[in-house]
């Protein structure tokens, strides 16, 4: 409903600051890979959506991670954020009320996904369709 409380797991300022916190080499490598693969973005997104709709989390994780060869980049863009979100979710679930959380599908696939971190905190996680 329109009266429902809304919030964000991260602010835009925080996300921009995330890139500033990366080593310059990681920033440059990410920019170069992004520029070199600009023509592959739409087909890759289509493949990612197909993997998600098929319920193939491993296939989605493989697609997501093929461009994250820099450990500092993977840690900053995915793993630490997933862990932070899982902690927020775990804490929020201790309070009454209904919570709807939406994140990009890439955060829900593979090792160190949001689900992995929630499971480590003793929560039961299952995909529903």
Sequence positions of predicted segments:
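C-terminal structured interaction module
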Residues: 98-129
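Hydrophobic, often amphipathic alpha-helical segments used for membrane interaction and targeting
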Residues: 1-94, 114
């Amino acid at each position: 409903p329109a009266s429902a409380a809304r919030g964000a797991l991260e602010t835009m300022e925080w996300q921009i600051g995330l890139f500033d916190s990366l080593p310059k080499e990681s920033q440059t490598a990410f920019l170069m890979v992004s520029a070199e693969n600009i023509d592959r973005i739409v087909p890759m997104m289509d493949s990612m959506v197909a993997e998600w709709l098929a319920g193939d989390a491993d296939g989605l994780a493989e697609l997501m991670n093929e461009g994250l060869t820099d450990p500092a980049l993977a840690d900053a863009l995915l793993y630490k954020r997933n862990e932070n979100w899982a902690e927020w979710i775990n804490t929020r679930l201790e309070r009454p009320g209904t919570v709807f959380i939406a994140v990009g599908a890439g955060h829900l696939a593979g090792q160190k996904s949001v689900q992995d971190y929630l499971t480590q905190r003793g929560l039961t996680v299952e995909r529903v369709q």
